[in-house]
Amino acid sequence: MRKILIALVRFYQTGISPFLPPSCRYYPTCSSYMIQAIQKHGAIKGLAMGIGRILRCHPFIKGGYDPVPDHFTVFRNKSVDH
C-alpha cells in the first residue's frame, strides 16, 4: 500500500505539478511531506497527515518550515521554531 501511494504522489510530482504554478506555502512541499509521512508513519496515518497538510496549505496562511513530526498528528508541527 505504501509503494502504491508513494508512486501516485511521485506521478503527481513529475506528471502534473510541473504544469501548474507553484502554490505550496510550506517547506517541504505538500507532496514531499506526504511521501515522508507515509514512509515514517505508514500508509493510513501518513495519508491522513498528508491530507491534513494539503488542507492547511492555502493563500491565507504564512506557511514556512513544517517537517513531518515524529508522532502522528494531522495538525501543524508545533515543535519547530517558525
UniProtKB/Swiss-Prot annotation:
It is a peripheral membrane protein. It is found in: Cell membrane. Keywords: Cell membrane, Membrane. One of its GO terms (cellular component) is plasma membrane. Its main location: membrane. The keyword Transferase does not apply. It comes from the Bacteria. InterPro entries: Membr_insert_effic_factor_YidD (IPR002696). It holds the Pfam family YidD. The keyword Membrane applies. Belongs to the UPF0161 family. Could be involved in insertion of integral membrane proteins into the membrane. This is Putative membrane protein insertion efficiency factor. It comes from Latilactobacillus sakei subsp. sakei (strain 23K) (Lactobacillus sakei subsp. sakei). The lineage of its organism: Bacteria, Bacillati, Bacillota, Bacilli, Lactobacillales.
